[in-house]
Amino acid sequence: MTAPIWMASPPEVHSALLSSGPGPGPLLVSAEGWHSLSIAYAETADELAALLAAVQAGTWDGPTAAVYVAAHTPYLAWLVQASANSAAMATRQETAATAYGTALAAMPTLAELGANHALHGVLMATNFFGINTIPIALNESDYARMWIQAATTMASYQAVSTAAVAAAPQTTPAPQIVKANAPTAASDEPNQVQEWLQWLQKIGYTDFYNNVIQPFINWLTNLPFLQAMFSGFDPWLPSLGNPLTFLSPANIAFALGYPMDIGSYVAFLSQTFAFIGADLAAAFASGNPATIAFTLMFTTVEAIGTIITDTIALVKTLLEQTLALLPAALPLLAAPLAPLTLAPASAAGGFAGLSGLAGLVGIPPSAPPVIPPVAAIAPSIPTPTPTPAPAPAPTAVTAPTPPPGPPPPPVTAPPPVTGAGIQSFGYLVGDLNSAAQARKAVGTGVRKKTPEPDSAEAPAAAAAPEEQVQPQRRRRPKIKQLGRGYEYLDLDPETGHDPTGSPQGAGTLGFAGTTHKASPGQVAGLITLPNDAFGGSPRTPMMPGTWDTDSATRVE
């Protein structure tokens, strides 16, 4: 990196840049913080040293105490070194602050430069016949002195501040407090950024970038024009705003190896846009159109490059996490599909369960026709009046005994639901259903009250095994009303036509030579008579007003 040529700029530029900055105050505050940190490190080191000395003095006995002291010794050394580094950093910052104060004191002020310019203008205005030649020469020599003084001051300040920053020590991370001979953890994840850097070094890309691309970036960054333009607020902006900077091995390794999460992604982008906002604010505050234009160009490239780099790192991390969780998530995703895989094995049982729906059809394939129940009830029709005498009771019991075969099939068959029995057609014959139900009730009551003979027990005992094999009969739902009570008859047909006078049998009505009107007149309403025995109800429908019933003619 070449140093800027301070002699190329007038002293007004150096004086304005040096006097318009924040001053040595922030550097002194930072130095004070480093001093405090150095003291804290030293106190912690003293406390740990006292603890280890107490352990060695006999607080603990055995090999464990020796292992404890050995494990804490590297950390104690790091505390001492960190304290020294913090103190050195504070000293370097104080040196830079002192250099700034010295440069500010040696720099010609803007007031001196302004007075020189004002005096030069007066001398030039009153230089009649060259009487002010010597004062003008002295004034110009004084301005040249201030020019050289400003350039020398800036060069000295740059040298001192650069040396102070370069000599500042860097503190290494604190070592782990582990056993001296403890093996390193094998479960630690490898540093992917370092792996990518090694791979880029192996294929030769790092050497190509350092020997070809990086010198070109340095040449563009160190142009005097850009250095003079951005040295006041962000001298690194020409480098960060160069697209070739994002092709560096470090940036590529960061994009492909850094474990980026959502929080880090937002934090990195927020920091970048904060810097960009500060650069834009400084550029617009300068009021220089060239500075504003170059700042907009460089900050745009910096924003686009940073977004692309961080987005690649985030997408790569999300893909790796998804692939790592995929083996654990597959069983959870396949759990809802497990019943579908077992469907062929249980299909037979599932379809067998649908056989119960066959009863809803009312016509089973193996069931006999539903005619026998009608024949069983038919003999009860000639006896419309039931008699309470006990004489018919034996006949009701002994009559079905000789032919026991026909009744069992209707009992074992599933009851039809669609109403194929006699009860559904009871409304066709008057009192048929009611007589059958009454006869059934009387017969049932007699059978319950009359003891059965011993001869009827043998067929029942013989039929017992068959009844055990047959399924249990489902009870027929009780009908609270007669069969015809469920039927509805519309006595009055509903038509959508308005009532009109019938033209049939009337012939052609109206005067001769007139056109016959095809559509008859609409009825206007009903005639209501005065109050009489019928209560003023309508008597005669209202006929068309042009219909003369006496002459059978119609005036149109």
Swiss-Prot record:
Source organism superkingdom: Bacteria
Keywords: Host cytoplasm, Host nucleus, Secreted, Virulence
Region span, SH3-like: 201-256
Cellular compartments annotated: Secreted; Host cytoplasm; Host nucleus
Sequence ranges of Low complexity compositional bias: 456-471
Consequence of substituting Y209A: Does not affect interaction with NCF2 and ROS production
Keyword Secreted: yes
Region (Leucine zipper motif): 319-340
Compositional bias per record (Basic residues), positions renumbered to this chain: 472-481
Region (PPE): 8-164
Entries under InterPro entries matching the protein: PPE-PPW_C, PPE_dom, PPE_sf
Residue stretches of biased makeup (Pro residues): 400-417
Motif Nuclear localization signal, residue range(s) on this chain: 473-481
Pfam families per record: PPE (PF00823), PPE-PPW (PF18878)
Region (Disordered): 385-418, 443-556
Principal cellular location given in the protein's record: secreted
Cellular component GO terms, alphabetical: cytosol; extracellular region; host cell cytoplasm; host cell nucleus; plasma membrane
Gene Ontology process terms (BP): response to host immune response
Domain notes: Contains a conserved PPE N-terminal domain and a variable C-terminal domain. The C-terminal region includes a SH3-like region, a leucine zipper DNA-binding motif and a functional nuclear localization signal (NLS).
Homology family: Belongs to the mycobacterial PPE family.
Function recorded in the entry: Inhibits nitric oxide (NO) production in activated macrophages. Acts by inhibiting expression of the host inducible nitric oxide synthase (iNOS). PPE2 is translocated into the host macrophage nucleus, where it interacts with a GATA-binding site overlapping with the TATA box of NOS2 (iNOS) promoter, and strongly inhibits NOS2 gene transcription. Reduction in NO production in turn facilitates intracellular survival of the bacilli inside the macrophage.
Other facts noted in the record for this chain: Shows a strong immunoreactivity toward tuberculosis patient sera compared to that of BCG-vaccinated controls. Could be an attractive candidate for serodiagnosis to discriminate patients with active tuberculosis from BCG-vaccinated individuals. Could diagnose both pulmonary and extrapulmonary tuberculosis cases. However, it has lower sensitivity to detect smear negative and extrapulmonary cases as compared to PPE17/Rv1168c. Was identified as a high-confidence drug target.
Protein name: PPE family protein PPE2
Species of origin: Mycobacterium tuberculosis (strain ATCC 25618 / H37Rv)
